[in-house]
């Protein structure tokens, strides 16, 4: 348990930040799921729109450090490959 006033304040701030970061991570997952579901449904136009909406969100969360930049790149790359594969079918 934190003893100093500074440590107690940091503990309070960390709780608040953890809740906020969890919300942002959830938002990223939601955008990714929307894209994946559109791809699974086989609808190219919906999948493309979902992907275009997801990319800036993924990038923004990587910039903020919510997700690692390599993880963001991996998600974007895999989603883009799936959307392109859907276009060729």
UniProtKB/Swiss-Prot annotation:
Listed Basic residues bias regions: 7-21
GO CC, one annotated term: cytosol
Pfam families: Ribosomal_S20p
Stretch list, region Disordered: 1-21
Hydrolase as UniProt keyword: no
InterPro entries, per database record: Ribosomal_bS20 (IPR002583), Ribosomal_bS20_sf (IPR036510)
Family: Belongs to the bacterial ribosomal protein bS20 family.
Name this polypeptide is given: Small ribosomal subunit protein bS20
Highest classification ranks of the organism: Bacteria, Pseudomonadati, Pseudomonadota, Gammaproteobacteria, Moraxellales
């Amino acid at each position: 348990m934190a003893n100093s006033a500074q440590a107690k304040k940091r503990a309070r701030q960390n709780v608040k930040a953890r809740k906020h970061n969890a919300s942002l991570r959830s938002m990223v997952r939601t955008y990714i799921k929307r894209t994946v579901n559109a791809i699974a449904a086989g609808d190219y136009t919906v999948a493309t729109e979902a992907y275009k909406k997801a990319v800036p969100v993924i990038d923004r969360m990587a910039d903020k450090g919510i997700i690692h930049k390599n993880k963001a790149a991996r998600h974007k790359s895999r989603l883009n490959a799936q959307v392109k594969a859907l276009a060729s079918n």
